[in-house]
Every structure is written in C-alpha cells, then in structure tokens.
Amino acid sequence: AGFRDSFTLFGKKPIEKLIYLNCNIKETVYNAAEKVINSNAECIVCMDDKICCQVLEKFQAIQVSVPKDIKLVSFYDSYFLEHCKPAVTSLRFDEANLGIIACEELIGRIEQRTYSSRVYTGYKVMLRASTR
C-alpha cells in the first residue's frame, strides 16, 4: 500500500501489528480501533470516511477523547468528516479528475500505449480539530 512507501521515504518503519486492512464491517473496525487505542498509539489513519466515522463512534462509546487521547485522520475527505464532532483532518482531492486519469491510464494499457507507472494528482490537507 502507498502509505508504507511514505514510511520508507521518511526513514521510518510502520508497526505492522497496528495496521488493519480490509475492515469491511463495523465489528472489525470497532475491534481494530479498540486494539489500537489499547496499544497507546498517537494517531489512527483511516482509509476512508465511513471507516473513520465508525472509529469515532467506537471511541465515543468507550469514552476515548479525540484528539486528547488519540488523533484521527482520513485519507478521504467528505461532508461527514467535516461535520463530525470533532471535525476530522483528511485529504481532499478532485475525484472526477482522478477518475478521468484512471480511465485514461486503463485505456492506454488496453490499447498497449505507453503509460505511467505512477500518476500524481493534487490534494489538499484539510487540517481540523481531530489532530489539534
């Protein structure tokens, strides 16, 4: 996953036992959130807004305070994260443009044209209360 590349770029090593991927149902998200909070992690990074909202829900149920006890961020910004209590720091990007670029790359590969192995799109960090 790309987030692992960022660790390498900054000379860091992720704590693998604290990485929970494929949390597709609320119960697995809740279990992962509880394990992370019990490990004394500083921050949770969620892959999307739905998972992030579920983490917040779990924390409220077990009286964990964001950002006092743990910080919370998401790779995907949405209206919901902007209006959560607390509002969640996230990445905002142009979804339509990303879709266009992805389709162009796929068509290029299908037609066996030259394509990029990596495509960079713009994004903006929406710094909010969950990390302050």
Tell where the protein language model's regions lie, with residue ranges:
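Bacterial carbohydrate/catabolite-sensing allosteric modules
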Residues: 1-132
